[in-house]
């Protein structure tokens, strides 16, 4: 995989460099609530601009249905990128139309333009190779060189991620090079003991990575909504908690395999419960109760790991050499259910281990709960991408850059 440093050595002055970034930031109306992904691509964009490239930044945001939708405009992200760069950034109101062409043609050396949301075009995400290829052709008309730096999208077989690199000289940006380097540490030469903390709502989303980690990890800590399927698999009542009954046989099999391989599965010993899901708009006090994890009352739902579990999980992370964390321990966006996630984040900071936060909600939680991002070994920008990499899957965006 050739990197941006090789491109810079070749020289980029006056060349149109297409940067496939991941500016898929959370918005409250037009206000960006977490600009982490924009800041993550800044080194690549800034270095190219400094070297005299005419930088064309493209990204998706959200899941519009292949047509323009103002709610998913990249205009706020483009404005924030300009603020972070300390420079004017042109914004095209379409992706491959008149506005995009004018924005790119208007660039002088060292200037940056951002195209409108790639997913406003059906060809970006099409499963039809010809339709996707035709859209990639139109994107290719706007550039001389391709730099892939949207790690959060490399697991998608989309036109800008997979098809476009085949049409242009292609290089990995700083972010993708860093992400791949870190994830290789977790797969090829991991320092032991290796602990993995997995949370999030659905166990079905994590089955692939658990299956793979049973061959790699020494200890797996489970939290979040997915924990209740594990508790049910052990024969416990889980009340009104989130439960994927159809996954219980697979979970039972994984628990048995873990025993056979000497992998320690750690489940909570207590949980915070309430009769209803909290009000996420008002964040009104929810007054949860703490109950034993194996004695959740009927009609009550578990919404975070409890105080004893927080201590247990912290103790399981103190004697590790490597920790990978993906997924919150509870409904961390509500203050009454944030302490489990906070405890895990603090345990990672306190641990002497090399710590990796696996993107998605975990990365958001680190920022929302006010932790210093530099206190962790690495915070990934790709939740789904990092999980699929750890599963050993071929990621289309990386395969395209290696081709």
Regions found by a protein language model. Name each.
Residues 1-403:
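Active-site loop-to-helix "anion-binding N-cap" substructures in soluble metabolic enzymes
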């Amino acid at each position: 995989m050739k990197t941006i440093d090789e491109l810079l050595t070749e020289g980029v002055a006056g060349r149109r460099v297409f940067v496939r970034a991941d500016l898929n930031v959370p918005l409250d109306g037009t206000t960006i609530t977490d600009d982490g992904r924009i800041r993550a691509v800044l080194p690549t964009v800034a270095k190219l601009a400094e070297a005299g490239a005419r930088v064309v930044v493209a990204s998706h945001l959200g899941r519009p249905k292949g047509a323009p939708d103002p709610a998913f405009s990249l205009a706020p992200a483009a404005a924030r990128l300009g603020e972070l760069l300390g420079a004017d950034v042109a914004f095209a109101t379409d992706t491959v139309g008149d506005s995009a062409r004018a924005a790119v043609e208007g660039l002088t050396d060292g200037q940056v333009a951002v195209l409108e949301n790639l997913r406003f075009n059906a060809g970006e995400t099409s499963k039809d190779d010809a339709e996707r290829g035709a859209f990639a052709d139109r994107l290719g008309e706007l550039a001389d060189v391709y730099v892939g730096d949207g790690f959060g999208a490399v697991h998608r077989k989309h036109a800008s991620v997979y098809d476009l690199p085949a049409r242009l000289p292609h290089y990995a940006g700083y972010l993708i090079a860093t992400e791949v380097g870190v994830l290789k540490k977790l797969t090829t030469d991991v320092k032991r003991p290796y602990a993995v903390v997995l949370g999030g709502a659905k166990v079905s989303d994590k089955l692939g990575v658990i299956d793979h980690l049973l061959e790699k990890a020494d200890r797996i800590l489970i939290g979040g909504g997915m924990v209740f399927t594990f508790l049910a698999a052990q024969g416990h009542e889980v009340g009104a908690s989130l439960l994927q009954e159809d996954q219980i046989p697979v979970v039972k099999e994984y628990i048995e395999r873990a025993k056979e391989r000497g992998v320690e599965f750690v489940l909570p010993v207590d949980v915070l419960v309430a009769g209803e899901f909290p009000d996420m708009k008002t964040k009104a006090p929810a007054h949860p109760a703490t109950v034993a994890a194996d004695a959740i009352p009927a009609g009550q739902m578990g919404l975070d790991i409890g105080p004893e579990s927080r201590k247990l999980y912290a103790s399981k992370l103190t004697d590790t050499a490597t920790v990978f964390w993906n997924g919150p321990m509870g409904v961390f966006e509500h203050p009454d259910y944030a302490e489990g996630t906070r405890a895990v984040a603090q345990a990672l900071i306190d641990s002497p281990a090399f710590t990796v936060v696996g993107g998605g909600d975990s990365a958001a939680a680190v920022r929302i709960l006010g932790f210093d991002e530099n206190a962790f070994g690495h915070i990934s920008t790709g939740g789904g991408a990092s999980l699929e990499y750890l599963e050993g899957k071929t990621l289309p965006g990386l395969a395209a850059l290696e081709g």
